[in-house]
Curated annotation (Swiss-Prot):
Record family assignment: Belongs to the LacAB/RpiB family.
Pathway: Carbohydrate metabolism; D-galactose 6-phosphate degradation; D-tagatose 6-phosphate from D-galactose 6-phosphate: step 1/1
InterPro entries: LacA (IPR004783), RpiB_LacA_LacB (IPR003500), RpiB_LacA_LacB_sf (IPR036569)
Name assigned to this protein: Galactose-6-phosphate isomerase subunit LacA 1
One of the record's GO molecular function terms: galactose-6-phosphate isomerase activity
Gene symbol of the encoding locus: lacA1
Length: 141
């Protein structure tokens, strides 16, 4: 499974830490960061790369996570979550089949970021009753 990473200038240092962590865990990383672009362009690049192949997940890091979340949720078929704790990262995969998370580097420290990312990439989608919600989300955008 490939993990797509992106960041703006405010999130790049934390993104690099996340990148190293995921590589150590054995994940294939595709880093689409353009440090000279803002969060909107970088979020769109992450989403585009996610949609290019089945099974990809994405992580976008900026200062607070809110902006990239708003961008991602405007895109057809993109279920995204802004997360700042491990449990939410894990559960958004299990219940919402989220394909992207957004993280705020000014909110989340290095160790918490690693735990968030681990929960997100290892969390299985539960399907079943949750698929109804996912279908509803996919119809909205």
């Amino acid at each position: 499974m490939a993990i797509i990473l992106g960041a703006d200038a405010h999130g790049n240092a934390l993104k690099e830490l996340i990148k190293s962590f995921l590589q150590e865990e054995g994940y294939d990383i595709i880093d689409v960061t353009d440090i000279n672009s803002d969060f909107i362009d970088n979020t769109l690049a992450v989403a585009k790369a996610i949609n290019e192949a089945e099974g990809r997940l994405g992580i976008m890091v900026d200062a607070y996570g809110a902006g990239p979340f708003m961008v991602a949720t405007k895109l057809k078929g993109m279920v995204a979550a802004e997360v700042s704790d491990e449990r939410s990262a894990y559960m958004t995969r299990g219940h919402n089949n989220a394909r992207m998370i957004t993280i705020g580097a000014e909110i989340v420290g290095p160790e918490l970021a690693k735990n968030i990312v681990k929960g997100f990439v290892t969390g299985p989608y539960d399907g079943g009753r949750h698929q109804i919600r996912v279908d509803m989300l996919n119809k909205m955008a």
